[in-house]
Curated annotation (Swiss-Prot):
Gene: tilS
Origin: domain of life: Bacteria
Residues reported to bind ATP: 26-31
Molecular function terms from GO: ATP binding; tRNA(Ile)-lysidine synthase activity
Organism: Bartonella henselae (strain ATCC 49882 / DSM 28221 / CCUG 30454 / Houston 1)
Name used for this protein in its record: tRNA(Ile)-lysidine synthase
Disulfide bond annotation, renumbered to this chain: none
Keyword RNA-binding on entry: no
Amino acid sequence: MCVRLAGNLFKTSDFIQCQKLILAVSGGSDSLALLFLVKDHLKTLSVPPEIIVVTVDHQLRQESAREASIVAEICRAHHIQHRIVRWEGKKPKTHIASSARVARYDLLFQEAQKQGATLIMTGHTLNDQVETYQMRYQRLQKSADVLQQEAFAEMGGGVHADVLQQEAFAERCERMGVGGHGGDIAEKSDGLIYERGLSCIPREALLRGTVRLIRPLLGVKRETLRTYLRLKEKTWIEDPTNEDCNFERVRVRQSLQPKKFTCIARKVHEAALQRRQQAKNIADLILALDITVEYGRCFIAKPALFLQKHPGFPFVVGLFAVLMGGGFYLLPHKKLSTLVQKLSLHSSEKRRFTYAGSVIEYNRSGIAFWREARNIKEAIVEKGQTFLWDGRYQITNHSHEPIKVGAAGLQQLKSLFKNNNFNLENTHFPSLKSLLMISNDKGYDIPELAYHAAMQHTITIRRIMAPFDWLLSSQDAAFVNVVQPFFDIKVKG
């Protein structure tokens, strides 16, 4: 069983150009099984990477330090390098699970950078997939219930109220991609957002654009891994919070029957396939559209009618609105529907509104986006500091003095144009005023327009796509790779 299990879990591509590998091991059954499975598999490789086991001590329970020490002893017995990293500082009182997840990945990434590792593996299992699906599905059903109540309120009383309520509810659920009769999530080719979420945890992702994150156990049940450990006569640590019903995941776990578990596992697989196909369809659509991004402004020329009616078109519009506005999250399906309803590409007059941090201007020639002027703040980037400004620019100050970052001023823009003899056709100052400006006591720069070496400060600037910068799912890679060149702005001083 051990050999067969290990042979089915890993791909040849998992270890390509990998000299050092970080394994996240807490001491629980899932991660401990991962450790021994990887150890066994690497024996089959001619040039295996070096294993470095990392245990994250979240310091949320008194037992956590002792548990980390137990993992260290296991690694020492098997001659494997081991590191303990700790989540320091004050812990949040709410959303502790999600906050711990972010902290955990940040700590793993930092250790990977420190060790020169290009790959992190974690022990997420099929149980994690199924539980995640069920939690997200239940939230969708709650949203559907809210819609039903809103629809009834809109219809009012009367003999036809129930019929009207059902029709309105079904119509709104149809727009959201949620089944309107308490059934499954509607399987629609254009249900972009909800199938996206129900695809759950991807096998592979890219952490901070540099380190691969692979979860090879996603297709394996937890009990299978525990059987594997028993056969190897290995014991694992039981986390008491796994039985604490104050946590949503525990309640969901305890409610899942074997038959339902199998059914949900199949749905996760189908949703993942659909999400990857949708990503490819969106990538093809973006390539078919006439899109330009320059000087803080994105413009989508009015597409042919069949492209406007493409099921992915609302997603593309929402995507560029978020990216130009510096948002960290893609728009949910309900907001995409609202956004598309606001657009009329048949109007001869220019119309304008703000959405997702962007100004969106449209008429029969197309759609323009730029960062709205509201809530753009100035900041000081100290020497040696890396700072994310406005959700759009990552700035690293390599100089020996602080710099100020903020939006370009109108006076500075006009002066720059005059002194550098710029000839920008159809200059659009509202979008230019959203560009990053860097200044100190020696002067200022607007790096996307000009860079003044005379300022004698050294900086690195990178235009980021915030929803994908921290963690990019392989399921989204198809369209992200197509969008990336539009925002491939790098300045090195």
